[in-house]
Amino acid sequence: VLRFASGAEWIKPLTSLDDFFWNDLKAGGVTDLGSALNELNKKLSRSEFLQSDTGFCIPVIMFMSDGEPTDDYTKALKNINETNKWFKHATKIAIAVGDGADVDVLAKVSGNIEAVVSVNDVETLKMLIKVASVTSSMINSKSRTSSDTNNAVEIIKTTMNELNDASDLDTHFGEEKTAEPQNTSSSDDGWSDDDWN
């Protein structure tokens, strides 16, 4: 878990889903999204988080924010999108917490407005993270032949279907349509390259 309030700091190391335990996060400080993206760019590599002799799972990255960026996130986002193949191919989901969250920015970071879910209470947030984590694990264990954005959308839709079984949850899925999705498709799938960090 990478907290980005005043600066960015890892408050939980990389954890498998089976070992993850949710602790309530406290909002505080500013929203240094650029610092968080720079820190993620450093750690999302074979020399840091993705050390394995047996293979790698595609990362699932969940962004949560209750505000709008207070630093220059655009340069950091451009840099991580252009230089980090793990980020580029990761399944990215964004959670807008409360009315003050900048959904447009979260859509840019996740690459698709449909990968953004708005929540307004802690219980819904906890359930969303749990269900999205399990769903992400199941979907990312399949073959990666479709686009990464489609995987995020599939995860969100599956998660929302699971959450809709509980009638008192307050979520909104991809309602704002102002951000343009990033084009992540190309003829080169990048998996055969040796230049992954």
Model segments located where?
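Conserved beta-strand scaffold positions in the cores of enzyme catalytic domains, especially
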Residues: 1, 92-94, 114-118
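Mixed-charge (Asp/Glu-Lys/Arg
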Residues: 73, 77-82, 149
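Arginine/glycine-rich "motif VI" loop of SF2 helicases in the C-terminal RecA-like domain
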Residues: 81-90
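Von Willebrand factor A/integrin I-like adhesion domains
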Residues: 99-160
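Extended acidic, low-complexity intrinsically disordered regions
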Residues: 122, 140-197
